[in-house]
Amino acid sequence: MINVRQGVFHLRNEEASYLFRVKDGFLEHLHFGARAETSDAPAFAARPGCGWGDSTLYREGSNADCLDILPLEWSGCGRGDYRESPLELSIGGRAVSTDFRYLGCEVLKEPPPSALPVSRGQTILAVYLEDAAAKLRLTLLYGVLPTAFTRRAILENCGSSAVHIRKCMSACTELPGDWELHTFSGGWIAEMQHTRTPVTLARTCLESTTGASSSRANPGFLLAAPDAGEQAGAVYGFNLLYSGSHYLSAQKSLQGLTRVLQGISPANFDWELAPGARFETPEAVMAYSGAGFGGLSACFHRYVNEHLIPPDWQGRPRPIVYNSWEGCMFDFTESKLLRLGRAAKQLGCELFVLDDGWFGKRNSDTTSLGDYTVNEKKLPGGLRGLGEKLNAMGLQFGLWFEPESVSPDSELYRQHPDWALHDVLGREDLLGRHQLLLDLTKPEVRDYLVESVGGILDAAPISYVKWDMNRHSCALGAQQHAFVLGLYDVLRRIFLPRPQILLESCSSGGNRFDCGMLWFSPQIWCSDDTDPVERLRIQQSLSFLYPPSCFGTHVSASPHAQTLRHTPLSTRGNVSLFGCLGYELDLTELLPVEQAEIRAQTEFYRAHRRTLQYGRFTRGRTDGGGTVWQMQTKQETVAAVFHGLQPAAPGYEHLRVTGLDGEKQYRLTSRPQLLRVGDFGTLLRHVLPVKLNPNGLAVQTADSLYRMSDGSQSLTASGAAFAAGICLAPRFAGTGYDPDGRMQGDFGSNVYFIQEVCSHEKP
């Protein structure tokens, strides 16, 4: 709902209200939070009284007439507001003040066209402002969606001289009260490290300058009340539909107002706005919940699933993937791929992805990026031949590309060295992963990518694309932004005409996990780190703002290439169940019992896929220190408990399941899991009638053919009992093997299926 009445603007959705008003030509922010009425506007208005003694007055005569103490929807420079400004400009090489005043507004049924991704299905309020002295017009666009609001800005040069934009944010938001800023930063294979910082008088900033949204600083962040929990408390969520360098800041004023800015990074930014030209910012998205972090996550998950990802993939089940990379890397033949395909099909996979190494002379990562012609020595039947053979097995066919990059050792670079991004002063090129970036600001480069990639997609039965990008940019400021606009143009032209293709984006893992890419790609590779212990943290952090339906989650071999850690196959599978399940290891090396375990994982996933991809996600902890993930639909609940290091003599552990009807009966059943005989080592001597060498042939043979039951549990209880906490099967306590106990040791986990007991089943 958008209500405009007597200078008051009220945006309201199913969860929250957003109110502001026109005051003396400025836009005064009134309220963003719990649902309210338009008539409440006067109650929310700031009351500065006699003002503060050091105020710079906008008009002489009233100490309260000072922009520095008011909550504002937008603020300029040099007119008395000394807080951080969302806009910085220069004209003729000199910084200039800005002073935008209200002109009018209109309600639009749909967003105006944009070169940037814009949320789907929103109603728009357009508010028009003007700086008469600078001859500039500013349009603030507000969008209303069922669980979120959006904001962006469009600046138009109405004068006769060029204006240089040094900084132009997407949104300026002001909130009263005390808040903690929750951010998610990190690096390669260490993405999404959750940090909590109190918002104080000192400004807190988080910024990416790499040319991508980056694993260093995810664009999504939260503002939460200090006492907020998973189920209760005020929490705000913010994100940005942008895949380039970005910026956020939060700072509390002496008056108790927290100003939040979000938008394109201003670092080295200088965008020339010619007379008559317009500059548009990326769209910011924000949501509020009074039901804690879980409520806020539900708002954002619904937003992403229903208003962000491509319409053809909204609500569609994601296939179980087998990716060839860790099983083959660059060393493969068609016959080897087909062997892997047969193994993948037998284990329950539905889509075979040929990763790197299929084009040019790509036998290492030092060559051939940009040369997207099939290597016929490896694939004598071409991509079509391979794809048709995989289709005949009952597998879909997917393909990996890295289109934004070029190898210096490639035919493309030798023919068009000017197509790469180079230093503007001609300095020596800096390589990342042995490659350069193509200059996507050039139309001819974009045309080449659209034609070459599009031609391959049309010439073979390809139903999935993994789009990778593996280096940071050396471009600066405005050139970085122009590159992102070029990327979006390429993605639009390739994939909008081919909506049947499932696109998964990737950038050295989670280096570009953002809402801008989700507008094109329904799922994103979370991280190059597939160690489930690390993935548990990464995926939990992602879950605050992104739904599991867009997580690329694969089971890999142990010990893990990123950590050298040994983890159980059960835990690798259990973590990967909560997302878009896939496998990335050499399937031909699996033991028979491992094959059986993977088949059980894929069977469980297919049976509960809708819940695991689209259910309501809740985070929790057990009293035994376990991490709890819960996915719930109206029909069923899937919950998992994950542990770190095994303690000595662990106590009782209780699982609390939320969202059930307290008066109904529910049955909990654990997903069957198995233990390796060899994991017990010399302890086998205490339970067997004969002494066996734990490293000997007998134990190795048993290990390859036999597994022991682990963590089996089944019980029936009321929803009220589940909410209070049901007691789980005991963990290993050093006193023997319990076939009904949980015996995993370090990094163990269990998954539980919970469903209402039908009336005829009740005792």
Locations of regions flagged by a protein language model:
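Polysaccharide-binding surfaces and accessory modules of carbohydrate-active proteins
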Residues: G7-E14, L27-Q251, A267, K664-A698
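Conserved, mostly hydrophobic/aromatic
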Residues: E15, A153, G276, Y322, ...
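Short Pro-Gly-centered flexible turn/kink motifs
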Residues: E88, A95-Y102, W271-G290, D746-Q755
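Extended acidic/polar, glycine-enriched regions
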Residues: P146, I154, A162-V163, Y242-Y247, ...
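Carbohydrate-binding surface patches
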Residues: L222, T622-E663
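Aromatic-lined carbohydrate-binding/catalytic grooves of carbohydrate-active enzymes
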Residues: W313-E451, I462-Y464
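Active-site neighborhood of glycoside hydrolase catalytic domains
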Residues: N375-G382, R414-S570, L577-Q595
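C-terminal beta-sandwich/jelly-roll accessory domains of carbohydrate-active enzymes
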Residues: Q646-P763
